[in-house]
Amino acid sequence: MRALKVLALVFAPLVSLTVCGQNRADAAPATAGVAGAAYDTSAAANQRFLADYAARPDVKKLPDGLMYRVLRAAASDGPQVQKNSDTVWVYYKGTLINGKVFDKTKPEEPTSFQVGGVIPGWTEALKLMKTGDTWELVIPPDLAYASDGKGDAIPPNQSLVFLVSLTKVEYAP
């Protein structure tokens, strides 16, 4: 009987993590090799990274330079963002092209914000996603923080890689 209690204590959290993690950005398929040690944050490495990513057959490229891969498509035609004043709930992880994580949501809860209150690359991508989608975004500098960068976390003129899971859309009145 005691052994069963021990097994229950060991396996219950594992099952919980597996089930609860299904909507998290970290739970998306591995993206090893997308960003990492092969790239530094120099301008030349940034250009090489963008070219390498664009050459992948599963990447969708938009005219303004935003690129993405659909890692998990929504099971149905879920709600989509309609305007910049809509609020979304997402799980995400943002990295530089060298693989350094600069921001991410907490695993237990998504974050929410107005679609128009984020960098242009995010706004554009969110308007294309459906609730339930998980995408990998590659956002070029001019759709991110451009020559300004963002404090010590994001140097100027950096492309950014995001893993994004859209969990909810609330329409603005």
Can you describe what each PLM-predicted range is?
Residues 2-173:
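Cross-family detector of peptidyl-prolyl cis-trans isomerase
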